[in-house]
Amino acid sequence: MSGHEHYNENYVLADNLYEHVHAPLSTLFWQAPWACDGTPGGYAVYEFDGGKVNWYYKCVGKDKDYQFELYPVGASRNKKEAVVANVWNYDSTWKVKWYENGIDKGEMTRFSGYDPAIYEYCEKNSSTFKHKYLGADITEHLFYAVPETKDSEIRVEVTDHCGNVYTRKMQQSK
C-alpha cells in the first residue's frame, strides 16, 4: 500500500503482488471534495477472512456501493460526445460495461483525461486555494461510451476484482 499521493491508482504486478496507491481522506489538501483525479474523499477498507483479502474504497458520507461516478454527454472536456465514468478504484481485473435503453453495448473504452467534477471545481475555486499549485490532474481510470441517441437511458455496470457489481443509471436529455 502506498499513501502519500493525492490520487487513486491500482496495479496488478503479478498474481500475488498488487500495489494500491490510496487517495487521501484530505482529498486535495482539504481544498476540494475530491482528489486531483476525481476520487471523492474517503479511505480503503480491507477485509480479511483466513487467507482471503477483499477490499474496496469507502467514500465519506456515501454507501459502500458508491464506487464510481457517471457523467452525462457534454460533461467531459476530453470526450464531449460521450458519457464518462470515473472508476476510482479500478484495476485491470475490473469490467466496465454499459447499456443503452436496456441493450448491452459491451465494455466502455478506457482513456486518460480529467474528471469533470474536480476539473470544473478547480477552474471556479483555485484562486481561493491555500496552495496555488493545486488543481485537477489527468487520470487513467476514466471510461467513455458514445450513445446512439440523445435521449437514451444509460446504465453502467462496474464489476470489481471480487465480483461485486455496482450500477448507476442516467436518463440522457435531448
Can you describe what each PLM-predicted range is?
Residues 1-74, 104-106, 123-124:
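Conserved beta-sheet core of the metallophosphoesterase superfamily
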Residues 70-174:
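Long, low-complexity serine/threonine/glycine- and acidic-rich segments characteristic of extracellular
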